[in-house]
Amino acid sequence: MTLLALGINHKTAPVSLRERVTFSPDTLDQALESLLSQPMVQGGVVLSTCNRTELYLSVEEQDNLHDKLVRWLCDYHNLDEEEVRNSLYWHHDNDAVSHLMRVASGLDSLVLGEPQILGQVKKAFADSGRGHANASELERMFQKSFSVAKRVRTETDIGASAVSVAFAACTLARQIFESLSTVTVMLVGAGETIELAARHLREHNVQKMIIANRTRERAQRLADEVGAEVIGLGDIDERLKDADIIISSTASPLPIIGKGMMERALKARRNQPMLLVDIAVPRDVEPEVGKLANAYLYSVDDLQSIIQHNLAQRKAAAVQAESIVEQEACEFMAWLRAQSVSETIREYRAQADQVREELTSKALAALRTGGDAEAIMQDLARKLTNRLIHTPTKSLQQAARDGDDERLHILRNSLGLE
């Protein structure tokens, strides 16, 4: 049995290929059934995200194993083998375990240390239940990887610093305001970055959120999710005074918030400070706003410097995380090797028990017929010894006849003679 990981990801293949190798949730059971029907596959888990498609397998080693798996993958997706082959990577046994642990810990992600991948790996494991039901080593590998990912999060700072624009904006807000539970945030736009920012803010219990967007319908969907109020872009001038923090990210070609608008808002607020985080390109906030007293304006470039600093911190933490993964992978493989010999030990013990029961039964029968007890016990001990050492003796003799000194040494060592 061999543990095997194969796949493609954002490092090895463009999105035009990755999107054609994905496994949709609707057809996952069908894919697993097809995969498990391959004679060499004992168990499998399919991980398919926007950045990677990977198969984690328990397989029987055989000739042309890689070719057979590539052929299955390409046949299933109706792809040309040559198109896929150069983008695939393969990891066996210890390397497969290390790879899964790295993936689950966010060490192999497009955004180093991102936490979402652990949830995706857990979901893949759950959704692939039929694929690993009869592959205990595969189940154990995933369960161990989940605990390693948790350890990496706990013992390192891999996820402590913001490395996305949305998260950096929220981190900046939390640094300036002691608590978000007393502030009102206005989010301008309703795109992906604003969605991420809204979710971060909700997690930190912001007092109130106002979403201003050109299309109210899209904004309303996000507002329903995070518990926010929706206004139109034309309402910003009137409502700006209510916001302590403004995070803006639209596709507008012209600024949405100007100096005059901010002056009116600050006057209405009696010059209580306002934080503006403009992450739009082109900018949503006129640069002159940053010159106003009590208006603290940060651009996407300011955030990038924060992100680069934090990314450097994550890379430093990743060194520690890699050490944890290496240690845990080695320990897991040692455990797995010990498990692989357990069945052999059970068979050997059962064989010895069978000999014991056979000879003991004969000895007891002899005792019942009135035979000499001491002679019967001596005979039992002699026969038991001879039967138990018969096979090791034959192995020693054969090794000697073959002139195999290394095998002789191993046999002597295993018998406790060295």
Curated annotation (Swiss-Prot):
Active site: C50
GO BP of this protein: protoporphyrinogen IX biosynthetic process from glutamate
Amino-acid positions noted as binding NADP(+) in the UniProt annotation, renumbered to this chain: G189, A190, G191, E192, T193, I194
InterPro entries: 4pyrrol_synth_GluRdtase (IPR000343), 4pyrrol_synth_GluRdtase_dimer (IPR015896), 4pyrrol_synth_GluRdtase_N (IPR015895), GluRdtase_CS (IPR018214), GluRdtase_dimer_dom_sf (IPR036453), GluRdtase_N_sf (IPR036343), NAD(P)-bd_dom_sf (IPR036291), Shikm_DH/Glu-tRNA_Rdtase (IPR006151)
Keyword Oxidoreductase: yes
A Pfam family the protein falls into: GlutR_N
Gene Ontology molecular function: glutamyl-tRNA reductase activity; NADP binding
Enzyme class: oxidoreductase
The reaction(s) this protein catalyses: (S)-4-amino-5-oxopentanoate + tRNA(Glu) + NADP(+) = L-glutamyl-tRNA(Glu) + NADPH + H(+)
Site entry (Important for activity), positions: H99
Pathway(s) served: Porphyrin-containing compound metabolism; protoporphyrin-IX biosynthesis; 5-aminolevulinate from L-glutamyl-tRNA(Glu): step 1/2
Swiss-Prot/TrEMBL domain comment: Possesses an unusual extended V-shaped dimeric structure with each monomer consisting of three distinct domains arranged along a curved 'spinal' alpha-helix. The N-terminal catalytic domain specifically recognizes the glutamate moiety of the substrate. The second domain is the NADPH-binding domain, and the third C-terminal domain is responsible for dimerization.
Cross-referenced NCBIfam families: hemA
Assembly and oligomerization: Homodimer.
Other remarks in the entry: During catalysis, the active site Cys acts as a nucleophile attacking the alpha-carbonyl group of tRNA-bound glutamate with the formation of a thioester intermediate between enzyme and glutamate, and the concomitant release of tRNA(Glu). The thioester intermediate is finally reduced by direct hydride transfer from NADPH, to form the product GSA.
Protein name: Glutamyl-tRNA reductase
Species of origin: Cronobacter sakazakii (strain ATCC BAA-894) (Enterobacter sakazakii)
The organism's taxonomic lineage, starting at the top: Bacteria, Pseudomonadati, Pseudomonadota, Gammaproteobacteria, Enterobacterales
Encoding gene (name): hemA
